[in-house]
C-alpha cells in the first residue's frame, strides 16, 4: 500500500470564528475502498466489573458512558471522529515518530477517540481519560483492514469543547499536550507541538534523555525530539488554509476548506481518499445546541453534510450503518482480515450511483451537484435558525433530523 497522505483536523475560536461559535472540522483520509459509517450510541449504565470489547482488546468498562455520535471505518470499534452529548468533539491523526509504533495489538488511536467521548464531559476530561488508558493499555495494532501488512502508527488528537481545545500528541505511552483557547489550529499526520507544552507525561523528558534524543541542555522541543529525521521541519499544506480566510469562519467556511482538493486537504489519490468528513459548531453560549454535520460518504466535494443534534430520543439511522457480521467478522477472527466482506451501507451504495453520474456525465453531473448543494444549503439554513433563535429547542423536532436527511438523500439519488 502507498504511503498515506495527510488528513486534517481544524478548529477555529472566536473572534476568528463567527458569532461566539467554536467551529471544528475533520477529513478522514483512508484507503479508497474503506467504508465509513455514522453511528449513534445512547448514554448507558454498565454493571460493575464489566468489560468493553474494543477493536483488538477488552478493557474495564466504566459505570456510565455518555451518548455519542461517531464516524468510523466499519470494521473497527472506535472512531475516526465524533462528538458526545456534552459538546466534546475528538478527531484522531495517525503519526509516525522517532519511536516506531507497536504492531502488538493494544488500543488503536481510533479506540481512544471513542473512549474519550464516552467517558469525558469536557475536553480536558477526555484528554485525562485517553492518557490514563494509554498508560494502562498502550497503543498498537493494524490501522488498516489489511491481511498482508501491519500498518501501525502513533496517535495525535484534537479534543474540543465549547470553551477550549487540546492538541494531544503521543509516542507510545508518552505524551504532550497544548491548550488552545483562541485563533485557528490545524493538525495533520505530523508531530506539531514545539516548546509550548501545557501538560505532559511525568517521565516524558527523562525518557527522551534515556534514549539520547535530548541532552537536557537546550529548550525541550517536543516535535524536534520525537519526530523522525527532519519530519518536523516540513509544514502541512493545509495549515494555512483556514488562517488565510479573511471573513469570519463559519460552518460553510469549514465545509469549503474540507472540500479543497488543490490544497491537499481533500484527498483523492490512487490508493487513498477522504472517506468521510465532519464539521461541528459549538456555541460558547451553553443554552444553544451543538450541531454536528456528517457526510457518511466519501469525498466531501461530492457529498452532502447532514446535521445531527443530541436529544433524548434520537432516531437511529440504519441506512448509514454497515452490516453487522458479529463473531464471524474477519476483523474479529485470528488471523485477521483473511476476507473483506461487503461493508457498504444503503447511503454508501446510493452515493456510488451519484459519484458515477458526476464522473461520467458532465451535464447531468452538474445538475446533480447543484441539487445536492441545494439540499445541503436548506439544512444549513434551518440549523442557522436554530442557533439564532431565542426560543428553546423542541427535542421532538430534531430527534429524527439526521435520519430524515439521510432518507431524503437516498431517495433523491434513486
From Swiss-Prot:
Residue numbers carrying N-acetylalanine: 2
Active-site residues, as the UniProt record annotates them: 9
UniProt KW keywords: Acetylation, Cytoplasm, Exocytosis
Taxonomy, superkingdom: Eukaryota
BP-aspect Gene Ontology terms: exocytosis; proteolysis
Further remark: 'Secern' is an archaic English term meaning 'secrete'.
Name of the featured protein: Secernin-1
Organism in which the protein naturally occurs: Bos taurus (Bovine)
Amino acid at each position: 500500500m502507498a504511503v498515506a497522505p495527510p488528513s486534517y483536523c481544524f478548529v477555529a475560536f472566536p473572534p476568528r470564528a463567527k458569532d461566539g461559535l467554536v467551529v471544528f472540522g475533520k477529513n478522514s483520509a483512508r484507503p479508497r475502498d474503506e467504508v465509513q459509517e455514522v453511528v449513534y450510541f445512547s448514554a448507558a449504565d454498565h454493571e460493575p466489573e464489566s468489560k468493553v470489547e474494543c477493536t483488538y482488546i477488552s478493557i474495564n468498562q466504566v459505570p456510565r458512558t455518555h451518548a455519542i455520535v461517531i464516524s468510523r471505518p466499519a470494521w473497527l470499534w472506535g472512531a475516526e471522529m465524533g462528538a458526545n452529548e456534552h459538546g466534546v468533539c475528538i478527531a484522531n491523526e495517525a503519526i509516525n515518530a522517532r519511536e516506531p509504533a507497536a504492531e502488538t495489538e493494544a488500543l488503536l488511536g481510533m479506540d481512544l477517540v471513542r473512549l474519550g467521548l464516552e467517558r469525558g464531559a469536557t475536553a480536558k476530561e477526555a484528554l485525562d481519560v485517553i492518557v490514563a488508558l494509554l498508560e494502562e493499555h498502550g497503543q498498537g495494532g493494524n490501522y488498516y483492514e489489511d491481511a498482508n501488512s501491519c500498518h501501525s502508527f502513533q496517535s495525535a488528537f484534537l479534543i474540543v469543547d465549547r470553551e477550549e481545545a487540546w492538541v494531544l500528541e503521543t509516542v507510545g505511552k508518552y505524551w504532550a499536550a497544548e491548550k488552545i483557547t483562541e485563533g485557528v489550529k490545524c493538525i495533520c499526520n505530523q508531530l506539531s507541538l514545539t516548546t509550548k507544552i501545557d501538560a505532559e507525561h511525568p517521565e516524558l523528558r527523562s525518557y527522551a534523555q534515556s534514549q539520547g534524543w535530548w541532552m537536557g541542555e537546550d529548550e525541550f522541543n517536543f516535535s524536534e525530539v520525537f519526530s523522525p529525521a527532519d519530519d518536523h521541519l516540513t509544514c502541512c499544506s493545509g495549515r494555512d488554509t483556514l488562517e488565510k480566510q479573511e471573513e469570519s469562519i463559519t460552518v460553510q467556511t469549514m465545509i469549503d476548506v474540507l472540500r479543497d482538493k488543490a490544497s491537499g486537504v481533500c484527498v483523492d489519490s490512487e490508493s487513498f481518499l477522504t472517506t468521510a468528513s465532519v464539521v461541528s459548531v459549538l456555541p460558547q453560549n451553553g443554552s444553544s445546541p451543538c450541531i454536528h454535520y456528517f457526510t457518511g460518504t466519501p469525498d466531501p466535494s461530492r457529498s452532502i453534510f447532514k446535521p445531527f443534534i443530541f436529544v433524548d430520543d434520537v432516531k437511529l439511522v440504519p441506512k448509514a450503518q454497515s452490516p453487522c457480521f458479529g463473531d464471524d467478522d474477519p476483523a474479529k477472527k485470528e488471523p485477521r482480515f483473511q476476507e473483506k466482506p461487503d461493508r457498504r451501507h444503503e447511503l454508501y451504495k446510493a452515493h456510488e450511483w451519484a459519484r458515477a453520474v458526476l464522473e461520467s456525465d458532465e451535464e447531468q453531473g452538474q445538475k446533480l451537484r447543484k441539487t445536492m448543494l441545494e439540499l445541503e444549503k436548506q439544512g444549513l439554513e434551518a440549523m442557522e435558525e436554530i442557533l439564532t433563535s431565542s426560543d428553546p429547542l423542541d427535542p421532538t423536532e430534531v430527534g429524527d433530523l439526521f435520519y430524515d436527511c439521510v432518507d431524503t438523500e437516498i431517495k433523491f439519488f434513486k
